[in-house]
């Protein structure tokens, strides 16, 4: 579903065309199809397609604003957010937060999903039930803090890269 803060018909068409070229068979949220609204969301991102976000039980968000994340959670949606900042409103409001860059996360997330395909429904429900986003965010902050302390004591700052495992490894 296309959902833009700065919405225009031209941008929607271009993004929809790009999504179709990438393999999407159905693209929601274009033009008048974005006819519903998320309550408690004031930005243009409140406009949604009633066949998409409103019907979904689980929503994957990247580059999101905290108001929409909160609104989706109030609608009892499972919200999975990809966010670089574990202190952002989106990260704090989401059901599950993956703290990393969305470009790096997507292939890793796809691999994790493939691994979980053979898992029983009962085990998946238990995995979800036992997941604690607050604990995850705390671990991410600990990782970032320890990494910053290490960088402050070495010349690695100039290299400026995350370790090979990245943050996604500890948060998926």
Show which residues each predicted segment covers.
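Short, structured coil segments at secondary-structure junctions
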Residues: 22-23, 75-76, 92-93
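Solvent-exposed alpha-helices and their adjacent loops that cap or buttress functional pockets
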Residues: 51-55, 71-74, 89-91
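Long, charge-dense
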Residues: 1-45
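Active-site glycine-rich loop that binds ribose-phosphate moieties when present
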Residues: 34-54, 60-67
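Short, acidic/turn-prone active-site loops that include or flank metal/cofactor-
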Residues: 31-33, 84-87, 102-105
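A short, gly/pro- and small-residue-rich
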Residues: 66-87
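C-terminal functional extensions of proteins
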Residues: 89-172
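Short, well-ordered beta-strand core segments
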Residues: 59-60, 78-79, 97
């Amino acid at each position: 579903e296309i959902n833009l803060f700065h919405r225009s018909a031209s941008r929607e068409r271009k993004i929809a065309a790009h999504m179709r070229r990438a393999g999407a068979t159905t693209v929601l949220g274009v033009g008048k199809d974005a006819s519903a609204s998320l309550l408690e969301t004031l930005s243009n991102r409140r406009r949604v397609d009633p066949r998409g976000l409103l019907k979904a039980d689980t929503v994957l968000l990247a580059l999101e604003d905290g108001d929409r994340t909160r609104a989706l959670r109030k609608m009892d949606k499972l919200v999975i957010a990809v966010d670089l900042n574990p202190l952002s409103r989106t990260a704090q409001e989401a059901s599950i937060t993956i703290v990393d860059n969305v470009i790096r996360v997507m292939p890793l997330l796809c691999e994790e999903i493939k691994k979980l395909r053979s898992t029983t429904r009962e085990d998946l429900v238990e995995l979800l039930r036992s997941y604690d986003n607050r604990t995850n965010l705390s671990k991410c902050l600990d990782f970032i803090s320890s990494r910053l302390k290490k960088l402050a004591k070495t010349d690695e700052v100039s290299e400026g890269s995350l370790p090979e495992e990245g943050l996604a490894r500890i948060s998926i």
